[in-house]
Amino acid sequence: MAVVKVKPTSPGRRAVVKVVHSHLHKGKPEASLLEPQIQNAGRNNNGHITIRHKGGGHKHHYRVVDFKRNKDGIPAKVERIEYDPNRTAHIALVCYADGERRYIIAPRGLEVGATILSGSEAPIKAGNTLPIRNIPVGSTMHCVELLAGKGAQIARSAGTSVTLLARESTYAQVRLRSGEVRRIHIECRATIGEVSNEEHNLRQYGKAGAIRWKGVRPTVRGVAMNPVDHPHGGGEGRTGEGQVPVSPWNTMTKGYRTRSNKRTQTFIVSRRKK
């Protein structure tokens, strides 16, 4: 890994900071693990915008990543580490002893030629997946399940991880990167180590066009709109909101908690730190 600041040959290049990964695969991805990805620009079947600030961007296929890691007892060899345009983390192409190939989230320090294993008997090593009941307290984990057998849902982005704090008879307590402490069933699976590409936050795009390549459209301030478009809109000249900051649909937008899932509220031991 190397952080490179390019020469300021133009205003768009002046602020660019690249993170160069020389170990990534230079060729094409595994064709059997690709799926077409239809771009809908944040619109639903009626053509209405349901997700703002999405549209355009470079075409790419979806890489089918194995988040369940359910091939127990079968060792897999890492063939290569690849870039994935759909996520911030790198992915690893592994080949199991029975010949099947799968993509997994590459943990930090995983190298080509290494062997990984899944199951309750797997050793405590980066890249191995075990039930939480078999992981020592204090271990660093990623790709953690919330429901046993559903697949990893927590700590999947670049550089993230969770820490196993305690383990009870049925549930274990883990601390997330946000500071939240959560109870998770001990039969849920997790992968040892932290996610790769921890230098992702060092990258500087340098110009708006680089963000457009990723399919992100501009975010317009409400005070710059007309009254028909936003509650903050209108006025003669430059004006403030004149009220509590709200969203385009007139719900409070700063400090207003939007969590409504009461069913899983009991699994949160302490809320995240602001």
From Swiss-Prot:
Cite the entry's keywords alphabetically: Ribonucleoprotein, Ribosomal protein, RNA-binding, rRNA-binding
Name the GO terms of the biological process aspect: cytoplasmic translation
Q: Which InterPro entries match?
A: NA-bd_OB-fold, Rib_uL2_dom2, Ribosomal_uL2, Ribosomal_uL2_bac/org-type, Ribosomal_uL2_C, Ribosomal_uL2_CS, Ribosomal_uL2_dom3, Ribosomal_uL2_RNA-bd_dom
**Gene Ontology CC entries for this record:** large ribosomal subunit
Query: Could you tell me which SUPFAM superfamilies the record lists for this protein?
Result: Nucleic acid-binding proteins, Translation proteins SH3-like domain
* Basic and acidic residues: compositionally biased ranges: 229-239
Residue span of region Disordered: 224-274
Pfam families associated with the record: Ribosomal_L2 (PF00181), Ribosomal_L2_C (PF03947)
Q: Please name the GO terms that the record assigns under molecular function.
A: rRNA binding; structural constituent of ribosome; transferase activity
Family under the similarity heading: Belongs to the universal ribosomal protein uL2 family.
Quote the NCBIfam families the UniProt record gives: rplB_bact
* Subunit annotation: Part of the 50S ribosomal subunit. Forms a bridge to the 30S subunit in the 70S ribosome.
Q: What does this protein do?
A: One of the primary rRNA binding proteins. Required for association of the 30S and 50S subunits to form the 70S ribosome, for tRNA binding and peptide bond formation. It has been suggested to have peptidyltransferase activity; this is somewhat controversial. Makes several contacts with the 16S rRNA in the 70S ribosome.
* Protein name, as recorded: Large ribosomal subunit protein uL2
